[in-house]
Amino acid sequence: MDDTLIYRKIEMEELKLELFRKFQRRQNVDRQLQKQGDAWVEQPVSLVEEWSKEDYEFLLTCLQDTIREGGVVFGAFEGNAVKGFASVSGNPLGYAGTYRDLTSLHVSRDMRGRGIGTRLFHLAAGWALAMGGQKLYIAANPAIESQLFDRALGCTDAQEPDEEHMKNAPKDRQLEYVL
């Protein structure tokens, strides 16, 4: 665990590009889990996931919408720069509304491996439980590192896969975490 960071809610007025000036969203992906029939199979790939200024602007819009619609955004701060963040939608998912959607969870490249993602995940899960959720819904990036992270936390395949998530990101693995 990295105890030098401050973990707290991010308020609407803080959501500006400047907040992410020291955030490094880059991931070199050499292996992914891909759905083949009923099984998830590890496949070699070669790609780099990195955000542009336009990607950050889109992210800000999404995070602002999350707060506006009753959700929450948590951040891990080094000084006044965010080094990790997680967001949860305020809108219930699932047939009975038992899911709360973990809409983002990212840690800056220079800060990975320090327990920041785990701490943000648990903050998000605690909030989801307090809001009446029974499960956290995760549309997991297919990169093997992301999949291993989610599995280590206890996430399992979602019992009620969300159609919109599957349509928007067909390679993502639909997971849940029981609160």
Predicted regions and their residues:
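Conserved GNAT acetyl-CoA-binding A-motif
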Residues: 128-141
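DNA-contacting interfaces and partner/effector-binding or oligomerization modules
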Residues: 2-21, 25-30
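Conserved catalytic-core motifs of GNAT/GCN5-like acyltransferases
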Residues: 137, 156-173
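Conserved acetyl-CoA-binding loop-helix of GNAT-fold acetyltransferases
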Residues: 104-107, 113-126, 152
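Short glycine/proline-centered loop/turn elements that form peptide/ligand docking sites
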Residues: 117, 121, 143-146, 163-170
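Acetyl-CoA-dependent GNAT
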Residues: 22-98, 103, 108, 178
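Conserved active-site tyrosine of GNAT-family acetyltransferases
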Residues: 149-151, 155
